[in-house]
């Protein structure tokens, strides 16, 4: 075997057969992590607030779940509860986190949950903890020009987040910072993934917050689109990114997970191309000002590790098809389509 090939093989050495703890296993991203980990041969221990809740039933139907998936009831704010879940695991994917702009519900639970997972990981001597942070911890800085590429060295301005009452971004930033501090103190190998807005097929039966972002343009509830931009990434790519940074010994630090940024006008154009039968808005709510320029997010670090991103158009198409297949979005009949077009 050539030296380069041997080195590559060693770098991505098979670690299937290991047990990975996935927190908040029933969530949108976490469900995909569980699915892909099982497909790769891992044993998965998923933490949930209530494993018996019907909304988590999809996990038990995943391929390999019967043999290699255990769902455990865990309160992430109870350190002993977290320790029990992590004990005996080789790695942890910490994905569970509140998604809210209520500061009391967002900040403290996110910070304490992250700390508890790192402490539990240290005690269990796990090989690596992979923490799902967010682009919200990275790009909120009024002093950074939109023309400057946002990369892993960037952090959100906490005072700006507080001033604008963006408690989601504030909570994500302080939770990630706390995770880094505790990991350093406890000697835990921590790697962080910072995804942008995540879309793609739903595995869970409920609609998640990011999917509502698309749904409103298809149901007719949004009559116009905003003069705003958003970066997108496929949920499968986010799950793969976590597995990649867990498996690659050389992975370290933070990894921005973004495919591309679109203006809302570009977003609705793609939706209208694939799904012309829906009442997708064609006018911007702000036609006086020039189009807002999108942020430029670097995804070089993940690409260098070998991640191939799914094109945003494919991601949007699969998101809508999933909403249709699960009954969250009705499919208009021909008469409705003609009415929309006229």
Swiss-Prot record:
Pathway this chain belongs to: Aromatic compound metabolism; phenylpropanoid biosynthesis
Keywords annotated in UniProt: Cytoplasm, Disulfide bond, NADP, Oxidoreductase
Family from the record: Belongs to the NAD(P)-dependent epimerase/dehydratase family. Dihydroflavonol-4-reductase subfamily.
Cystine residue pairs: 161-169
Disruption phenotype: Drastically reduced growth and lignin content, as well as death after flowering.
GO biological process, one term: phenylpropanoid biosynthetic process
Pfam families xref list: Epimerase
Localization annotation: Cytoplasm
Binding residues for NADP(+): 24-30, 49, 55, 75-76, 95-97, 168, 172, 195-198, 210
Free-text tissue specificity from the UniProt record: Mainly expressed in roots and stems, especially at the sixth internode and, to a lower extent, in leaves and flowers. Localized in vascular elements, with weaker expression in the interfascicular (xylem fiber) region.
InterPro entries in UniProt: Epimerase_deHydtase, NAD(P)-bd_dom_sf, NAD(P)_dehydrat-like
Gene Ontology terms: cellular component: cytoplasm
A GO term for molecular function: cinnamoyl-CoA reductase activity
Functional description taken from the UniProt entry: Involved in the latter stages of lignin biosynthesis. Catalyzes one of the last steps of monolignol biosynthesis, the conversion of cinnamoyl-CoAs into their corresponding cinnamaldehydes. Mediates the conversion of feruloyl-CoA to coniferylaldehyde. Also active, with a lower efficiency, toward coumaroyl-CoA, caffeoyl CoA and sinapoyl-CoA. Involved in the production of floral volatile phenylpropanoids in flowers of fragrant cultivars from cinnamic acid, a common precursor with the anthocyanin biosynthesis pathway involved in flower pigmentation.
Active site (catalytic residues): 172 (proton donor)
Record carries keyword Cytoplasm: yes
Domain of life the protein comes from: Eukaryota
Gene3D superfamilies: NAD(P)-binding Rossmann-like Domain
Protein name per the record: Cinnamoyl-CoA reductase 1
Major location (coarse): cytoplasm
E.C. numbers: 1.2.1.44, 1.2.1.-
Entry keyword annotation includes Disulfide bond: yes
Reactions catalysed according to its record: (E)-coniferaldehyde + NADP(+) + CoA = (E)-feruloyl-CoA + NADPH + H(+); (E)-4-coumaraldehyde + NADP(+) + CoA = (E)-4-coumaroyl-CoA + NADPH + H(+); (E)-sinapaldehyde + NADP(+) + CoA = (E)-sinapoyl-CoA + NADPH + H(+); (E)-cinnamaldehyde + NADP(+) + CoA = (E)-cinnamoyl-CoA + NADPH + H(+)
């Amino acid at each position: 075997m050539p030296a380069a090939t041997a080195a590559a093989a060693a770098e991505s050495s098979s670690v299937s057969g290991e047990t990975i703890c996935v927190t908040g296993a029933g969530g949108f991203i976490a469900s995909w992590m569980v699915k892909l980990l099982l497909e790769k041969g891992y044993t998965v221990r998923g933490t949930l607030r209530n494993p018996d809740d019907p909304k988590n039933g999809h996990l038990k139907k995943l391929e390999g779940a019967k043999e290699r998936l255990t769902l455990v009831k865990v309160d992430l704010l109870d350190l002993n509860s977290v320790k029990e879940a992590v004990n005996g695991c080789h790695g942890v994917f910490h994905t569970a986190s509140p998604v809210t702009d209520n500061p009391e519900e967002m900040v403290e639970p996110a910070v304490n949950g992250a700390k508890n997972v790192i402490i539990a990981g240290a005690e269990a001597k796990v090989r690596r903890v992979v923490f799902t942070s967010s682009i919200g911890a990275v790009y909120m800085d009024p002093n950074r020009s939109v023309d400057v590429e946002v990369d892993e060295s960037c952090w959100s301005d906490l005072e700006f987040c507080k001033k604008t009452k963006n408690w989601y971004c504030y909570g994500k930033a302080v939770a990630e910072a706390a995770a880094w501090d505790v990991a350093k103190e406890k000697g835990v190998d921590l790697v962080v993934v910072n995804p942008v807005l995540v879309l793609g097929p739903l595995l869970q039966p409920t609609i998640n917050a990011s999917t509502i972002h698309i749904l409103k343009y298809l149901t007719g509830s949004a009559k116009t689109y905003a003069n705003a931009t958003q970066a997108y990434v496929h949920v499968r790519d986010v799950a793969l990114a976590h597995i990649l940074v867990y498996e690659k010994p050389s992975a370290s630090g933070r990894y921005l997970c973004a495919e591309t940024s679109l203006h809302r006008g570009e977003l609705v154009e793609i939706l209208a191309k694939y799904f012309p039968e829906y009442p997708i808005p064609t006018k911007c709510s702000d036609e006086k000002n020039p189009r807002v320029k999108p942020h430029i997010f670097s995804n070089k670090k993940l690409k260098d590790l070998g991640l191939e991103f799914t094109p945003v158009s494919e991601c949007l198409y699969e998101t809508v098809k999933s909403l249709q297949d699960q009954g969250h979005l009705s499919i208009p009949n021909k008469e409705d389509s003609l009415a929309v077009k006229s």
